[in-house]
Amino acid sequence: MKTSVLLLPKTKRILETVGYQIKLARLRRNISSQLLADRAGISRATVWQIEKGESSVSIGAYLKCLECLGMAESFLNTAKDDPVGRMYQDAGLKNAKKGYK
């Protein structure tokens, strides 16, 4: 039996939002959950879990649904802007420069 990853409440809400957005995209295209499942090569139950934002579903299944809906490219924006990482990177570069004096 698969187990769900324990997520913080904020992270769980993000995953639920992604699932809801996938469901809206499917409904806007007038595609049944069974048809999406068939196209994605997953079960209808997995589509239902994705649309509920379940953390036990693989990221590959989420991406396959996005691909079937013509939205896989939107996944490329994930972590594209990383202000915190940039801050750490800049701080590290400043420290490295000080070491060379």
Regions found by a protein language model. Name each.
Residues L76-K101:
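Short, charged recognition helix plus adjacent turn
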Residues N30-W48:
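Short alpha-helical DNA-recognition segment
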